[in-house]
């Protein structure tokens, strides 16, 4: 069994989200952009609001 401190570290790394691009940040796909943003396909590509809102 793992020590308590190791288990807490595992939880921290599992819950950590990947870095994302903010509004107007450069992108190549929608997954590059933060939540509620999508990659605008016209060049130059940048993250723009996808029209959704948080509930």
From Swiss-Prot:
One of its GO terms (cellular component) is extracellular region. Expressed by the venom gland. GO terms for molecular function: ion channel inhibitor activity; toxin activity. The keyword Amino-acid biosynthesis does not apply. It is found in: Secreted. It holds the Pfam family Toxin_12. Keywords: Disulfide bond, Ion channel impairing toxin, Knottin, Secreted, Toxin. Residues 1-19 form a propeptide. Disulfide bonds join 20-34, 27-39, 33-47. The presence of a 'disulfide through disulfide knot' structurally defines this protein as a knottin. Belongs to the neurotoxin 10 (Hwtx-1) family. 06 (F4b) subfamily. Probable ion channel inhibitor. This is U2-theraphotoxin-Cg1a. It comes from Chilobrachys guangxiensis.
